[in-house]
């Protein structure tokens, strides 16, 4: 970890440094809060990089599409994306290519997923441009650090307006039906993140 936070503020740090917890003492993030609320303090400690020496950030492959969509939309960064020329992951060659990409720290997606991904990101960009926030300026992936008493807290909103009056949070979903998305908000505890 390269970044160290020593006082409350807004910081520009890497994704990896944020998830390694750059605060002076173990800090509370939305991920830790979810575990505290759903399970227990002991479970939260096991999933905290400063409280568990054996902690490994195991990003689930089920979030790959959302992770890449965020990187493309927020930072115009495709460096972690590798497109695999295969119809699915069932062949030996596709599995080997997928595993090699993961070993390099990349996120592999299939060609058909790449087309869907680019359409998704394009739609989000069009929506932002044409919406009420289209004239505002935002900084992506800023790290916010503050203290509540003696407890350090941190957050990493997708977009923070430069005048600090608005935070936007980009979410991907399997079902755009409003009722289904409301259920997803509860299931994924999005209310703790935003």
Model-assigned labels for residue ranges:
Residues 1-155:
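Metal-dependent nuclease catalytic cores that hydrolyze phosphodiester bonds in DNA/RNA
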Residues 138-194:
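Mg2+/Mn2+-dependent nuclease catalytic core
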